[in-house]
C-alpha cells in the first residue's frame, strides 16, 4: 500500500516558501533580505495555486522558491551583513561613551565585501553579461546626471560618470554605435557589440529635482551591482581593443568640464605582464619564441617553392580528356546571402562623418553630439562656453559643418554648411547623409522618426513615397484647385465614402445631424429608420451584383468555412478580422492625411 502524503509536506507547499519563513530561515531583516535578493538575482514567484502553496491559507503573501532561499544560506555576503550589524552596534556604543580612539580603530576594521564572485556566478560568459547591461547603462547614466544630496553621494555620481565615459570611449573607438533617437524621456542609443544589440537611454542634462517618493535604498543596491558589472564589462571591452584599463584622466581638463576629452586612451602591452610574472614556463617559451618564428618562416618558404614547382609541372602536362565538373553556386541562396551581407554593411555605415569636421554652437547639446559624431568617424570642436578641450576654434577653416539651433546667424563663415542638430541623428539612423537644405537654420524640420519601430507588411510607412495613383490624385486636385473647382483629395471621386474610416464620435454626430434633418423635413423617426435600413440593403445588394464569379465562389467558401467553425473559433476569427479592418482604416486615414499635406506643400511652392 502506498504511503499517504502529509498535508503541506509535498507539492506546491514544499516548492514555495513565504517571505516571512525565508526571513526566519536566513535570520535577516527585511532590508538585508531585499539587498541579498537583488544582488543574487532572486525574485518572487507566482504559484499556480496560492492556497496550496500557503498550506490552505488565502492571506496575501509573497512566495519564493525554497531552493533559492536554500541557495542564499551559503552566501558569504550574508555573514558580512551580520558582521556589519555587530560593527554598527559597537561603533554607536563607542561614540555614545565618547571613546574616539576606539571608534577610529573600529572604523579602520569596518567589514567590507566584494561582488566579484556574484558577477561570475550570474554571468558565466561575457555574452551573458552583454545581454544584461541595458538596464545597467540606463541607471548609470541616470545617476551620473543626478545632483549630490544626502541620499546620493558625490563619490557615487563621480563613479557613474567615469564608467559611462569609459563605455562611450569604447563605442567611439570600436565604431559600435548604430542608432540614436531623441525622445521626450531622453536620448536612446543602440550599439552592436559582439553581435549583441545594446540599447540604453541617457537623460537630458537639465536641472534634476530628486523625488521624495522613491526608495533610494533599493536603487542604491541595484546601482552597487551595476557598477561592479560595468567594471568587469569595460575591462573586457578595453582588453579586446588592446587598450589599458582604466584610462588615464586629465584632472585639469575634467575640472574644466572637458567631458570625454579628459580621458586619455593608451595602448596596453601584454608581453611585459607575462615576463614579469612568476610563471617560469612562460619565460622559457618567450626566450625560445624568436627561434620558433624563424623555423616557421623557413618552412613556409619551402612550402611556397614546392607549390610553385608543382604548378609549373602541371602547366607543362597536356590536358586530359576527363574534365572536372564545375560546381557553380545556386543563384538564389548565394545571392541572397551576399545581398543580406551587403545590406548589413551599408546599413551600419560606421564612417559616415569621417570626411567632415563639425563645430558645435553653445546652444546645442554637446554631450550627445560629440559622442555620436565621433562614433561615426567625425571630428568635433565646440564653443568654449560648453567646456575646455576643443581641438580647434570657431574660425578654423577646416570646419565643414556648423551645428546651431537658432533661427538666424549674425556672423557666417564661408566654406561651411550651417545645419540643425537633427541632421546628425537622421543621417545616422538612415545610414546616408541627408539633404542639408532641409535642416538649415530656421527651416521647418522634417519629422524625427524612431529607428526602433519595425514597419510590417500591411502597416503604414511614413517614409514611403506616394504611389503613382496617389500622385495622380494630388496633381488632379491641384489642377482643379487652379481652375477654381475645390475637390478634396482625401477620397477618390469614383469610390463611395468609407464610413468605417470616420471615428465613432464623428459617426454619432453625423447620425444625429441626419435625424435632425429628417425631423425638420417632417419625416417620422420610424420611417427614417426604415429608409436607412432599405438603403443599406440596396447597397449590399448592389455590391453583391458587382462581384465576379470567382469572388462569389471565394466569398461562399469563406462563409462555409466560417459555418464549420466552433463558437470559440468564430469569435476569435471575427475579433481578428475587426482588428485588421481597424488597422487598415487607420492606415488609410494616415495615407489620406499625407496626400493632403503633399497637396498643401505643392500649393505653397506654386504660390
From Swiss-Prot:
Domain BRCT: 348-441
Name of a matching Pfam family: Pescadillo_N
SMART domains, sorted: BRCT (SM00292)
Cellular compartment(s): Nucleus, Nucleoplasm; Nucleus, Nucleolus
Organism: Schizosaccharomyces pombe (strain 972 / ATCC 24843) (Fission yeast)
Major site of localization recorded for this protein: nucleus
Subunit structure: Component of the NOP7 complex, composed of erb1/SPBC4F6.13c, ppp1/SPBC19F5.05c and ytm1/SPAC890.04c. Within the NOP7 complex erb1/SPBC4F6.13c appears to interact directly with ppp1/SPBC19F5.05c and ytm1/SPAC890.04c. The NOP7 complex also associates with the 66S pre-ribosome.
Region (Disordered): 301-341, 531-607
Coiled-coil parts of chain: 497-604
Function according to Swiss-Prot or TrEMBL: Component of the NOP7 complex, which is required for maturation of the 25S and 5.8S ribosomal RNAs and formation of the 60S ribosome.
Protein name: Pescadillo homolog
GO biological process, alphabetically ordered: assembly of large subunit precursor of preribosome; maturation of 5.8S rRNA from tricistronic rRNA transcript (SSU-rRNA, 5.8S rRNA, LSU-rRNA); maturation of LSU-rRNA from tricistronic rRNA transcript (SSU-rRNA, 5.8S rRNA, LSU-rRNA)
KW Phosphoprotein (keyword) present: no
Cited InterPro entries: BRCT_dom, BRCT_dom_sf, PES
Cellular component terms per the entry's GO annotation: nucleolus; nucleoplasm; nucleus; PeBoW complex; preribosome; preribosome, large subunit precursor
Biased composition (Acidic residues): 313-324
Amino acid at each position: 500500500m502506498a504511503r499517504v502524503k502529509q498535508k503541506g509536506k509535498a507539492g506546491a507547499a514544499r516548492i514555495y516558501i513565504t517571505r516571512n519563513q525565508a526571513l526566519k530561515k536566513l535570520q535577516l531583516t527585511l532590508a538585508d533580505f531585499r539587498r541579498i535578493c537583488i544582488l543574487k538575482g532572486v525574485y518572487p514567484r507566482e504559484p499556480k495555486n496560492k492556497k496550496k502553496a500557503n498550506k490552505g491559507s488565502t492571506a496575501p503573501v509573497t512566495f519564493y522558491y525554497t531552493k533559492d532561499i536554500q541557495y542564499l544560506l551559503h552566501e558569504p555576503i550574508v555573514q558580512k551583513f551580520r558582521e556589519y550589524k555587530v560593527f554598527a552596534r559597537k561603533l554607536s556604543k563607542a561614540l555614545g561613551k565618547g571613546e574616539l580612539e576606539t571608534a577610529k580603530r573600529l572604523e579602520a576594521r569596518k567589514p567590507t565585501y566584494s561582488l566579484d564572485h556574484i558577477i561570475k556566478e550570474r554571468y558565466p560568459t561575457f555574452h551573458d553579461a552583454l545581454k544584461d547591461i541595458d538596464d545597467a547603462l540606463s541607471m548609470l547614466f541616470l545617476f551620473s546626471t543626478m545632483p549630490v544630496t544626502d541620499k546620493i553621494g558625490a563619490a557615487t555620481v563621480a563613479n557613474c560618470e567615469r564608467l559611462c565615459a569609459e563605455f562611450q570611449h569604447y563605442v567611439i573607438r570600436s565604431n559600435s554605435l548604430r542608432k540614436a533617437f531623441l525622445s521626450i524621456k531622453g536620448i536612446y542609443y543602440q550599439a552592436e557589440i559582439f553581435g549583441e544589440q545594446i540599447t540604453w537611454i541617457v537623460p537630458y542634462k537639465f536641472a534634476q529635482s530628486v523625488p521624495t517618493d522613491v526608495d533610494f535604498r533599493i536603487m542604491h543596491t541595484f546601482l552597487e551591482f551595476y557598477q561592479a558589472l560595468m567594471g568587469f564589462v569595460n575591462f573586457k571591452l578595453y582588453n579586446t581593443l588592446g587598450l589599458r584599463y582604466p584610462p588615464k584622466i586629465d584632472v585639469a581638463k575634467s575640472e574644466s568640464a572637458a567631458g570625454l576629452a579628459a580621458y586619455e586612451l593608451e595602448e596596453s602591452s601584454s608581453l611585459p605582464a607575462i615576463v614579469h610574472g612568476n610563471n617560469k614556463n612562460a619565460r622559457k617559451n618567450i626566450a625560445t619564441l624568436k627561434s620558433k618564428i624563424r623555423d616557421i618562416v623557413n618552412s613556409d618558404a619551402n612550402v611556397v617553392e614546392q607549390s610553385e614547382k608543382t604548378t609549373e609541372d602541371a602547366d607543362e602536362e597536356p590536358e586530359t580528356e576527363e574534365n572536372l565538373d564545375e560546381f557553380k553556386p545556386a543563384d538564389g541562396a548565394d545571392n541572397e546571402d551576399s545581398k543580406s551581407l551587403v545590406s548589413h554593411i551599408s546599413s551600419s555605415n560606421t564612417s559616415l562623418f569621417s570626411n567632415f569636421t563639425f563645430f558645435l554652437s553653445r546652444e546645442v547639446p554637446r554631450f550627445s553630439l560629440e559622442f555620436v559624431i565621433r562614433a561615426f568617424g567625425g571630428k568635433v570642436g565646440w564653443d568654449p562656453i560648453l567646456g575646455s578641450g576643443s581641438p580647434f576654434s570657431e574660425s578654423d577653416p577646416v570646419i565643414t559643418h556648423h551645428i546651431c539651433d537658432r533661427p538666424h546667424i549674425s556672423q557666417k563663415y564661408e566654406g561651411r554648411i550651417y545645419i540643425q542638430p537633427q541632421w546628425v541623428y537622421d543621417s545616422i539612423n538612415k545610414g546616408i547623409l541627408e539633404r542639408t537644405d532641409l535642416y538649415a537654420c530656421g527651416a521647418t524640420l522634417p519629422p524625427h522618426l524612431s529607428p526602433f519601430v519595425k514597419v510590417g507588411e500591411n502597416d503604414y510607412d511614413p517614409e514611403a513615397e506616394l504611389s503613382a495613383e496617389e500622385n495622380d490624385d494630388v496633381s488632379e486636385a491641384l489642377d482643379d484647385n487652379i481652375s477654381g473647382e475645390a475637390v478634396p483629395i482625401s477620397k477618390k471621386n469614383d469610390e463611395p465614402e468609407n464610413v468605417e474610416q470616420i471615428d465613432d464620435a464623428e459617426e454619432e454626430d453625423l447620425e444625429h445631424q441626419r435625424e435632425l434633418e429628417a425631423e425638420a423635413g417632417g419625416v417620422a423617426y420610424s420611417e427614417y429608420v426604415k429608409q436607412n435600413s432599405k438603403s443599406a440593403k440596396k447597397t449590399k445588394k448592389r455590391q453583391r451584383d458587382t462581384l465576379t464569379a470567382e469572388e462569389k465562389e471565394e466569398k461562399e467558401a469563406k462563409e462555409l468555412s466560417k459555418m464549420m467553425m466552433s463558437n470559440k473559433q468564430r469569435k476569435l476569427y471575427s475579433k481578428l478580422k475587426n482588428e485588421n479592418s481597424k488597422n487598415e482604416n487607420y492606415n488609410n486615414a494616415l495615407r489620406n492625411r499625407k496626400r493632403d499635406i503633399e497637396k498643401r506643400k505643392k500649393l505653397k511652392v506654386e504660390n
